[in-house]
């Protein structure tokens, strides 16, 4: 079966060095050049026989990302893309924005960092962080929503996915009050996140219902794939931290986006530039 290896970056010069390892055995090389990012796509009649570890290491040194779609995704577009939200589809962390409103920024930020690095159980850390928000007026949710910084290219990614018939889902350990409006803003088809309990217009410091944690993210990916009638091998999972590893394992292709080392190691596919629509290079022909 034919295969492809893709180099992607917002700095075209960073593609040259790793490209020298890919060019000699490729049947052809094509380029995608936009105002914001570039990709070099190397096509192979069969599987790439070179040393992918060496390619990834050299790309990391230059700041380029490496995408190596396999199976169905090597020859056809995805049917479903599922993205983490905080620090993936957004450049901000929802809980940190709310913590600033509550005057608990430093305390909550420390817990968040440890959780995303895999040092703390997510469910326990979520409860600890949300407890810090007890008594916060519901108006802070709108403040946090307005302060949310959407990752460049998010809406463009959704539009590009829809053009090839793929659905897009947002799954987050964050909160429905922020994730649902974001999904509507960028045109995503599905969303799942945690719901904050509110009584008398104030946060109680608790969440309602099942927690969207590491395992739940994979469950939602499978659920949306089934609803969309898409084989799992035609799904893509995109994330940045330890909480994304289960959905990485469930998807046909896992992509670590501007990610922490634990996610990069698990996904083996990377985008290092802050243009999330660069992942459309996976299916560009």
Name each model-derived stretch.
Residues 39-43, 138-140, 161:
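Active-site-proximal beta-alpha loop/turn segments in soluble metabolic enzymes
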Residues 72-123:
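Active-site neighborhood of HAD-like aspartate-dependent phosphohydrolases
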Residues 128-132:
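Long, charge-rich alpha-helical interaction segments
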Residues 53, 142-285:
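C-terminal cap/substrate-recognition subdomain and adjoining C-terminal extension
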Residues 92-95, 105-109, 123-127, 138, ...:
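Hydrophobic, well-ordered secondary-structure segments
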Residues 1-83:
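Non-catalytic pre-domain segments flanking phosphatase-related domains
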Residues 103-104, 135, 196-198:
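Short connector loops/turns at beta-strand edges and beta->alpha or beta->beta junctions
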């Amino acid at each position: 079966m034919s295969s492809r290896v893709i180099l992607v970056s917002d700095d075209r010069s960073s593609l040259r060095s790793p490209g020298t390892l890919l060019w000699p055995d490729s049947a052809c090389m094509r380029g995608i050049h936009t105002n914001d990012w570039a990709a070099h796509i190397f096509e192979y009649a069969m599987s790439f026989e070179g040393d992918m570890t060496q390619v990834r290491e050299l790309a990391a040194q230059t700041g380029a990302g490496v995408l190596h779609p396999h199976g169905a995704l090597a020859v056809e577009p995805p049917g479903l893309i599922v993205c983490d939200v905080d620090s993936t589809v957004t450049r901000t962390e929802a809980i940190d924005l709310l913590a600033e409103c509550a005057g608990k920024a430093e305390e909550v930020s420390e817990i968040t960092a440890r959780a995303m690095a895999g040092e703390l159980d997510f469910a326990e850390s979520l409860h600890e962080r949300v407890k810090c928000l007890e008594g916060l007026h519901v108006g802070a949710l709108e403040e946090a929503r307005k302060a949310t910084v959407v990752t460049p290219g998010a809406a463009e990614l959704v539009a590009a996915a829809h053009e090839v018939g793929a659905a897009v889902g947002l799954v987050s350990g964050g909160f429905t009050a922020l994730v649902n409006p974001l999904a509507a803003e960028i045109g995503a088809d599905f969303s799942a996140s945690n719901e904050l309990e509110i009584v008398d217009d104030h946060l109680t410091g608790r969440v309602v219902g099942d927690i969207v944690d590491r395992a739940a993210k994979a469950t939602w990916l499978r659920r949306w794939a089934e609803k969309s009638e898409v084989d799992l091998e035609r799904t893509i999972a995109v994330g940045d931290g330890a909480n994304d590893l289960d959905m990485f394992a469930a998807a046909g292709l896992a992509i670590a986006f501007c990610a922490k080392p634990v996610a990069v190691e698990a996904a083996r596919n990377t985008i290092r530039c802050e243009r999330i629509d660069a992942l459309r290079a996976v299916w560009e022909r």
